[in-house]
């Protein structure tokens, strides 16, 4: 398992690091709280 950073879709801020198994082809998307936007937004896996 690797730690993958998640970027906020709205502002691009890196807010979270989540574990992800290696070998999965799809990119992770989660709805999380962004303190900079002060709202729940979609966070996508960054490279």
From Swiss-Prot:
Keyword Glycosyltransferase annotated: no
Gene3D superfamilies: Ribosomal protein L33 (2.20.28.120)
Entry annotated with the keyword ATP-binding: no
Biological process per Gene Ontology, one example term: translation
InterPro entries the record matches: Ribosomal_bL33, Ribosomal_bL33_CS, Ribosomal_bL33_sf, Ribosomal_zn-bd
UniProt keywords, alphabetically: Ribonucleoprotein, Ribosomal protein
HAMAP family: Ribosomal_bL33
Similarity comment: family membership: Belongs to the bacterial ribosomal protein bL33 family.
Protein name: Large ribosomal subunit protein bL33C
Lineage: Bacteria, Bacillati, Bacillota, Bacilli, Bacillales
Gene name of the encoded protein: rpmG3
